[in-house]
Each structure stands twice: as structure tokens, then as C-alpha cells.
Amino acid sequence: RICYSHKASLPRATKTCVENSCYKMFIRTSPDYISDRGCGCPTAMWPYQTACCKGDRCNK
């Protein structure tokens, strides 16, 4: 799986993962502000929320 791994406003970067999913993490009240991206599907703590997906570069 190829997932985006860049933080919020940094230039796009990808990484090859062994996990079969990608995620993006954002603040629940500001879903347009992505605070983190990467491989897998981690559990988020309030006020963050995780959106997980299963496809190459799906966590745009």
C-alpha cells in the first residue's frame, strides 16, 4: 500500500506501507485541517478523529 505521510501544510510525501490501510487524522471541529497522515488505522483521542481507507494514496 502507498500512503501519503506528510503533515498538514508540508509538501506531499508518500511512503510504502506493510499495512493494508491508510489514514488521515484531523480535528473534529476543523475537518479541513489534516494534522497527520500515514499507514494503518490508529485510534484517535478527542478532539482528533481518524478517517481510514484502503487504496493507494487514498488519504489525500
Curated annotation (Swiss-Prot):
GO MF assignments: calcium channel regulator activity; toxin activity
Keywords (A to Z) from UniProt: Calcium channel impairing toxin, Cardiotoxin, Disulfide bond, Ion channel impairing toxin, Secreted, Toxin, Voltage-gated calcium channel impairing toxin
Expression by tissue: Expressed by the venom gland.
Annotated disulfide bonds: 3-22, 17-39, 41-52, 53-58
SUPFAM superfamilies assigned to the protein according to its UniProt record, in alphabetical order: Snake toxin-like (SSF57302)
Pfam families registered for this protein in UniProt: Toxin_cobra-type
Gene3D superfamilies in alphabetical order: CD59
Function, as annotated: This specific blocker of the L-type calcium channel (Cav1/CACNA1) is a smooth muscle relaxant and an inhibitor of cardiac contractions.
Similarity comment: family membership: Belongs to the three-finger toxin family. Short-chain subfamily. L-type calcium blocker sub-subfamily.
Record protein name field: Toxin C10S2C2
Originating organism: Dendroaspis angusticeps (Eastern green mamba)
